[in-house]
């Protein structure tokens, strides 16, 4: 083809860097194991949905082998974030089981037939039959290797620009295909480079196939290895076809025909049996390449996702190198044989600097020299077009080549030697599980979005509901499953509520009038349309506890509480503050009691929360400062509204409030003595959220539902003041302050004290999104 890096060099730098755009996705396999590191023999968990219809969670060869799949996303970071979120969701749902973090299998049953093949019934029975055939050909133990598949598509607009700028005579479709095919050929030629640097399966447990164990040397307790191996998964003992075969990579048609010929000759049972290190993938149009699937990557057991983000960048850099580097010959059978031998050498001898690798001309070279040469080629070819965000990846690549001790295999061998194969990997599995629990409110890759939205999308992903982020800043998403589509904003603004109901909740005057008409108690008060009008009524409010607030407010903005209303200047300040935010202001009697947030979905109270100001409880020996530091270690606490609770601050405001009580940061509270650092109970200032769903009498819940029905709302957060939970609701012992049209769900899902009320699930239920299993039955 008439394509070289010279064409790329002729483009403006800002345009040439677009070559690093595209879409990215990951497929990851993990074996489920028990607490001893033995293969779990239990069925695929029902909590993970139906494996045949779930878009993100399924099984691979074995019923015990979970596969998680991300959708194509426009950056590696987003795709890895989605992968990590799926990993967290799966890990948390497992009961007394763990995700094995290593590509090499865990402790396997002695008899191969005891390894459960993934079960598929009904119309999907063929998938199980196919796996049974693979078991006969390869054995079940060989199929228990797991790995990472990295899916990458090249940027379409860049390819179009490249075609136009290069004044190519061939049609764009042919030009595009040529670029993809050239990239594949060069990847296959040089794949040994990635295996040598990124391999992470150097050791195998003794329960693996006896034929392979007999070839290996003892390494650690119950573990064996090739002395210089980087990736047993990629060598003669690993996950590969029974024989090497050569495909025609000239064009997509040639490739497909050569693959089909192997099926017709019974070399392969099915084209799915092509275990090549890279696959060419099409979708609805079989004549058009959609993306490339890189399949040679081991799980990196030092990372929860199995992927070092910098190594993902390295793979992308390497793929761009394969696109750009010159290609002098077609990928002949002889070249393919050389590439296969190089793969075997890299996988089996990759830690031996003196191992032999054949260069592009077929000449034998020392491995260390060829690594350095390949790095230099990549730097010269790719660096001029490297975006700033990929510089760390390039620097990591340089470290891996120049310092063998920095490679995952080298570090892994030291850990296994010291602790044991099973012991070390189980320690990693437990560490990752704890991290998953600690971060169970995060959608990785979407951490800039509201926490409530992240929670909703997490549960949507677990249910197999696909989603699109329509407006990231507005937290506006589209949910879709089995032909059903719903739009949601800020997790709780949905199609279930009509526009007039939202307006009624937004306008506090209207809210009060509607509730009054329904005979539901609200604070007595008046509305004012000018500061002078409100100030004129000061004599009426003097000496009474009042609340001054804008007509339309949220998050407590513009609200002033005056409990002893004896100073006109304080009253005037409150009026001025409220009118800064709204043209109409309410002045109401202050309602006594404690404030409770009722969350209502479809005429049901699904959560009730009480908020307590920032505080610490003494242990008799620690100062307030130490107690705050310790309390802030809770993984639910963070900064910037990215966690369910905020860290308690030790600043001037807290210092002044402590001083007003006769305390300081150095005060040592008595055991069980509670000291408050703030007067307001906002979560945003370090307050505690306490679940009261099961403690509030039913009479108050009934009133809350009546209030929601009066405004004809299906999802709302209702704030109610209650004098005492020891009494049932009466005419004078409660008051509804307001109803909110976009209430946060995260405070109910992860309270400081109490259980998760799963409001994310409740909203998905209300919208009609079932689990993946039920969706599959309906589809």
Swiss-Prot record:
Pfam family, one: ATP-grasp_3
Sites where the protein binds Mg(2+) 2: 738, 740
SUPFAM superfamilies: Glutamine synthetase/guanido kinase, Glutathione synthetase ATP-binding domain-like
Binding site for ATP: 539-597
Catalytic activity: L-cysteine + L-glutamate + ATP = gamma-L-glutamyl-L-cysteine + ADP + phosphate + H(+); gamma-L-glutamyl-L-cysteine + glycine + ATP = glutathione + ADP + phosphate + H(+)
InterPro entries, alphabetized: ATP-grasp, ATP-grasp_PylC-type, ATP_grasp_subdomain_1, Gln_synth/guanido_kin_cat_dom, Glu_cys_ligase, Glut_biosynth, Glut_cys_ligase, GshAB_ATP-grasp
The protein's Enzyme Commission number: 6.3.2.2, 6.3.2.3
Function (record text): Synthesizes glutathione from L-glutamate and L-cysteine via gamma-L-glutamyl-L-cysteine.
Annotated protein name in UniProt: Glutathione biosynthesis bifunctional protein GshAB
Natural source organism: Desulfotalea psychrophila (strain LSv54 / DSM 12343)
